[in-house]
Amino acid sequence: LEMESGNTITTSSEITILAPQVVHAGRSAADLTEEATFTGCILTMVLVNDVVGVGGYLEGELRARMNITDQAKDIRMELHSTEKSGDREDESVRQRVSLEKDVQLASERPYVWAFSLPVPERTLPTVQSGRTSVSWRLKAVVDTDTANAEYHLERKVQIFTST
């Protein structure tokens, strides 16, 4: 503040504190597990965490128990982003990692694939503000030779930035 004479009475500063979303310890494995049942298999995704900073990693396991024997062309994890602004919407695959290719999956046998999917360092965080939003989904895909038998499972994840 200044007086009419030009003498400064007080000065002020603005401080902005940015903090990542708080993740509470003690979340159960069930909180971080997603499961889908298909005629041909049961697909389960178990995450280490579903809230990650840019440049970090989404990690966990993809599990499958086959009800039929099937040939998988590709088993992969994908990170999808959806950006909405008003009536416009843009969805894209931001990251993809193949866990295994061309493998026969036998019935009644459990399969487990560990994964570590990097989150891009330069990206938008999860945000919802009026008619503008950015959201993220982690998708597990078991792409098979059987017609129309792509097994997939999705889970919303949160991405944050820090300075």
Residue locations for each model-derived region?
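C-terminal beta-sandwich interaction modules and adjacent acidic
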Residues: 1-163
